């Protein structure tokens, strides 16, 4: 079977393969990030989103893999064979888990569309010959250039006055903003 764990999310293994292996944080760092940001949702009996479900499954599979690795480390007496198993897990299976965890954490953090746009733009950048591409790779950020941020509770202005047409030279008063969290 040819199963692509990213297909239902609009991505592919190939799309993630454009990112170099050293791009992805360690599994430990990714697990810590997932716990810090999404512990309540991941431990909740409620269904939050397909990304939460995929993240739960990846975390559980990683735990099972570590249990197997501990068993192999304890029961495989030949040090050379043990090192081969550890090396294989770290380079192949570990990378797949790092990619999977990074993808779902990033989709939850930045939004699926932003992550997909990033993967496509990075893929285009990396395949463009160095002489014809910008020196810096695209950066995944929370606010893509097309995003418009508006304050809560205020209607959008019809037009924004240009800085040259300012009516008053006196300092502006600042409105106090509540520090409520916005989800």
Swiss-Prot record:
The keyword Phosphoprotein applies. A motif (Bipartite nuclear localization signal) lies at residues 158-175. GO terms for cellular component: host cell; host cell cytoplasm; T=4 icosahedral viral capsid. Keywords: Capsid protein, Cytoplasmic inwards viral transport, DNA-binding, Host cytoplasm, Host-virus interaction, Microtubular inwards viral transport, Phosphoprotein, Repeat, RNA-binding, T=4 icosahedral capsid protein, Viral penetration into host nucleus, Virion, Virus entry into host cell. Coiled coil: none annotated. Residues 136-183 are annotated as: Disordered. Pfam families: Hepatitis_core. It is found in: Virion; Host cytoplasm. InterPro entries: Hepatitis_core, Viral_capsid_core_dom_sf_HBV. Residues 155-177 are annotated as: 3 X 8 AA repeats of S-P-R-R-R-[PR]-S-Q. Residues 177-183 are annotated as: RNA binding. GO terms for molecular function: DNA binding; identical protein binding; RNA binding; structural molecule activity. The modification Phosphoserine is found at residues 155, 162, 170. Phosphorylated by host SRPK1, SRPK2, and maybe protein kinase C or GAPDH. Phosphorylation is critical for pregenomic RNA packaging. Protein kinase C phosphorylation is stimulated by HBx protein and may play a role in transport of the viral genome to the nucleus at the late step during the viral replication cycle. The keyword Heme does not apply. HAMAP family: HBV_HBEAG. Belongs to the orthohepadnavirus core antigen family. This is Capsid protein. The gene is C.
């Amino acid at each position: 079977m040819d199963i692509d764990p990213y297909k239902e999310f609009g991505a592919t293994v190939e799309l993630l393969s454009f990112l170099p292996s050293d791009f992805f944080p360690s599994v430990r760092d990714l697990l810590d990030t997932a716990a810090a940001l999404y512990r309540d949702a991941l431990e909740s009996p409620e269904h939050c989103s397909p990304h939460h479900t995929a993240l739960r499954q990846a975390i559980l599979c990683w735990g099972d893999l570590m249990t197997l690795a501990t068993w192999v480390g304890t029961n495989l007496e030949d040090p050379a064979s043990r090192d081969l198993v550890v090396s294989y897990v770290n380079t192949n299976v570990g990378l797949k888990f790092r990619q999977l965890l990074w993808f779902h954490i990033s989709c939850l953090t930045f939004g699926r569309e932003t992550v997909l746009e990033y993967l496509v733009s990075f893929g285009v950048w990396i395949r463009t010959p160095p002489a014809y591409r910008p020196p810096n790779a695209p950066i995944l950020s929370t606010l893509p250039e097309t995003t418009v941020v508006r304050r809560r509770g205020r209607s959008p202005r019809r037009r924004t006055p240009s800085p040259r047409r300012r009516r008053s030279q006196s300092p502006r008063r600042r409105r106090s903003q509540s520090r409520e969290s916005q989800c």
